[in-house]
Structures are given as C-alpha cells and as structure tokens.
Amino acid sequence: MSDIIFLNGMRFYGYHGALHAENELGQIFIVDVTLKVDLTEAGKTDNVKDTVHYGEVFEDVKNIVEGPSCQLIEHLAERIAKRI
C-alpha cells in the first residue's frame, strides 16, 4: 500500500541561478515535495518512529535551498530528491 504526503509552499531564500545577479541578490524559492511512502505500520503502531518526520524533511529541504548555490534549478531539485 502506498500513501502520499504533500509538503507544499515551503518558502526559502537562496542564491541559485545561471545569472550573476541571481547568485548575488538571491531570491525566494517556493518548494513543493511529494513523498510516496507506506504508512501502514505507523497506522497500526501509533509510533512516530514508523512514519515520516515532516519537520526533518522541511529542515533537509531548507538546508539544501539555503545552502551552496546551483546554476540550474534541475540540479537543486536533484539534490533535494537525493537527500529525502
């Protein structure tokens, strides 16, 4: 069984882009993440260890977006996908 968790509208300030101004001035990035997971065990046990910690996912995405700059948004998205 698969469940889907949506974390939508996460806003972070980052310095990504191919243009010098994007890296110098930065901008707001709005990130949506969709996680496909099996939460069957969490539903049975009521134990937080059996689920996804939304706060940790948020912090992981925040650290990536607010971290070292990327020229391409595609590269930034790949870094997020690999981490979560």
Curated annotation (Swiss-Prot):
**What processes does the entry annotate via GO biological process terms?**
folic acid biosynthetic process; tetrahydrofolate biosynthetic process
Tell me which UniProt keywords the record has, alphabetically. Answer: Folate biosynthesis, Isomerase, Lyase
Report which gene this protein is encoded by: folB
| Name listed for the protein in its UniProt record | Dihydroneopterin aldolase
Query: So, what pathway does this thing act in?
Result: Cofactor biosynthesis; tetrahydrofolate biosynthesis; 2-amino-4-hydroxy-6-hydroxymethyl-7,8-dihydropteridine diphosphate from 7,8-dihydroneopterin triphosphate: step 3/4
Record-level GO cellular component terms: cytoplasm
Q: What is its EC number?
A: 4.1.2.25, 5.1.99.8
User: Which annotated residues bind substrate?
Assistant: 22, 54, 73-74
Q: Which terms does the record give in the GO molecular function aspect?
A: dihydroneopterin aldolase activity; isomerase activity
What is the annotated role of this protein in its UniProt record? Answer: Catalyzes the conversion of 7,8-dihydroneopterin to 6-hydroxymethyl-7,8-dihydropterin. Can also catalyze the epimerization of carbon 2' of dihydroneopterin to dihydromonapterin.
Instruction: Read off the CDD domains from this record.
Output: DHNA_DHNTPE
